[in-house]
Each structure stands twice: as C-alpha cells, then as structure tokens.
Amino acid sequence: GRQPIQRDKTINDNYYLLTLAAIAKEIRQRGLPPECSVRIAAGLPLTSFGRDKPKFKDYLLRSNQPVNYKFEGVEYSITIEEVAIFPQGYAALMTETGLLQDEPSMLLMDLGGWTVDLMRIDNAIPAADTAHSLELGMIRCVDDIREQVRRETGLSLTDAQIENMLAGQPCTVSDTVRDIVNKQGRKYTEHLLSATMEAGFDLHAIPAVLLGGGASVVSRHLSPKDGLCKTIFLLDDKVNAVGFERALAAVSRRKSEA
C-alpha cells in the first residue's frame, strides 16, 4: 500500500529501510555480491532542497558502517561510501540535455503525491528564488474525484480505479462514472494551470516541463484553448532516478578531474 504522507523523511526510519531494500534489489539485479560498497544518489523537492539537504544527507549516510541487514532471505553487508543529494525534477532534466540547451527560460513542474513543486530555469540554471509549492498533488485530485463520484452515483471507487481511468487505462465502470472522472481530470488541470499563473509563472510566455505522477493526467486533459506556450512531458516514472544517477556520475567525474 501507499506510505502515509511524510513531509520530513528523517523523522523515522521508514524511508531509510525502504532505501536499504532498494539497494538490495539493485545489487541482486546487477549480480553483485551481497557484501559491497555503494554510492547513493537521492533527491529532495525543489522548494525544500536548500533547507533539508544537510539533514537528509546525514540521515542516509550513517556512522555505523557497514550496514548489516537481511532482505528476502539474503544477508547483506553494505558500506555506503557517499550520498549525493540533488533537486528533484531538475536532476531529471539530465536525461533530456537538449531541453536545457534549446530554451533560455522554462518552468519546471514536478507533480507529486501531495504537492506540485515549481521552479523557473534560466539559462540551464535553477532560479532558486522562484521556487514555489502548490498543495495540488495527485492525492488531492484522486480524493476530490472519489468524493464527486460518491456524491453523484453513490459508488465508492478505489484509488487504483481512479488512477487507471485518469491514465486512460482499462477499468470496468459505467460511462457515467468514466465521464465524471474525466470531467474532474479536466477540472484539476484547469485549477493547476490557474494556480501556477497566480503564483507568477506565465504559462503563455514560457515553456513548461512537467514530470511526476500527475504529469500523465495533465497531458491527457490539456486543451488547445489553454493557449500554453509549449509543454514538454517527461512521463517515465524512473526519470528522476536516471537523472540522479547521471548527476552523480557527473559529480564524480569532476572530482576525479580536479
């Protein structure tokens, strides 16, 4: 099931344990021995990156090395050599370097579970003073749809049903229910665009790069009448992870050349 919303991941060990599980899976997938050294590349939201980076790095890079644990019947002994923290969303642009080269200014929109994090990028550099967060993430969108369907039909849909319909995937429901979900998806998109404009970002004037869980929803519910300058969607759910890996490789390369 979904982990409860936790704005500060360092308040308990949940995220740390998930990280150890992910390391074990990665080691197994790559055919590495269960006793090895690793480097972690992780991310934080644009709006809290500067504030939370030192604490989050310490949270992941603990003094009791190596870390010994058992996962799915296998004993692991992992030495975490390095932890590098990058801004979510911006790191994902490492996967699409042409975007940074072709546009002098763009708006980065990371549509997460609880928030939509916004930041302008000028000449390939994040403008940190423009960082803004809207509490319009996908959890709120799904909750609003569930309530609207219940109000109009008396039915109680699951998150999975709603998410499938928003993504245009199969789901056995009536046309009436599907219409409600699609109308709410469009309503959510309109609300998000309006809130973004109100936050001071002119979507008619600068291109927007959208990623995160909500990006596919917006991609299906945009309309030509919205009159947006240009929208680029990074819909691969691994785009941030790939970006972190490339960013870490670039940092390591610079260190070795220094």
What residue spans do the PLM features occupy?
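Short, glycine/acidic-enriched loop or turn micro-motifs at the edges of active sites
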Residues: 91, 113-114
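Short beta-strand scaffold segments in enzyme catalytic cores
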Residues: 116-120
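Short glycine-enriched loops at secondary-structure junctions
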Residues: 112-113, 214
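Nucleotide/phosphate-binding catalytic cleft detector across ATP-hydrolyzing
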Residues: 1-106, 125-139, 160-258
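Short hydrophobic beta-strand that contains or immediately precedes a catalytic carboxylate
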Residues: 108-110
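Long, charge-rich alpha-helical interaction segments
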Residues: 143, 147-150
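Short, basic interhelical loop/turn and adjoining N-cap
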Residues: 153-155
